[in-house]
Amino acid sequence: SFGLISRTGILKQSSKLDQVGVFGKTVEDVALFAKTLIKKDILDEDTIHYAADEMLEVCKKGPIFEPKFIFYKTQSWKKISKGSQKAFEFLLKEFKKNIEVFDEPSYFKDIPKYHQIIHETDMANSFQDFYKKSKKKMGKKLVEAIERGLKYSAKDYVDAVDFMKQSYKSYSEVFEDYYGVITPASLGVADKGLLSTGSP
């Protein structure tokens, strides 16, 4: 939803990475919800004008042609929980006519590194007042991330942003032939309790 749904009023971490997620029971519910939220906002300079009025109607019509998706088993596949692996293997088997399995592009291995630089640098900037005034009240992992963010050089950050832009540009062609990409978003189900949300 980056550039489509405004982040105004939401705690800012990174203007380059922050985006609002939309959830619903059905695809139609998500379309109706998103249609309402998609607006140009002068307070969020990343938002753009986007015609979403017919989103629900288009969604109800279904796909124009048989949907095709790409599935990547990334370098982190071996770290993923057995339960999650089984779930994805089942998905691939059930929808094998719609999902093609590919090796990830070589530059994918650098994404976590550059993402971390952008995220932590922006977070250090966004949370600097909290860090200065209430460091002892903040979580250990958050403090460590902010302190790493304070140490990256300007070149580190510029290189990371350039990598992100080039990656988007290189990968955009994929969506001319495929509806989307399927890949695990985390290593598994979040830990029980409120102490942790699991692996980032």
Question: What does each model-found stretch correspond to?
Answer:
Residues I42-I48, K97-S106:
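Flexible, glycine/charged-enriched surface loops at secondary-structure junctions
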Residues T47, H115, V158-D159, G188-P200:
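Short, surface-exposed loop/helix-turn segments at secondary-structure junctions
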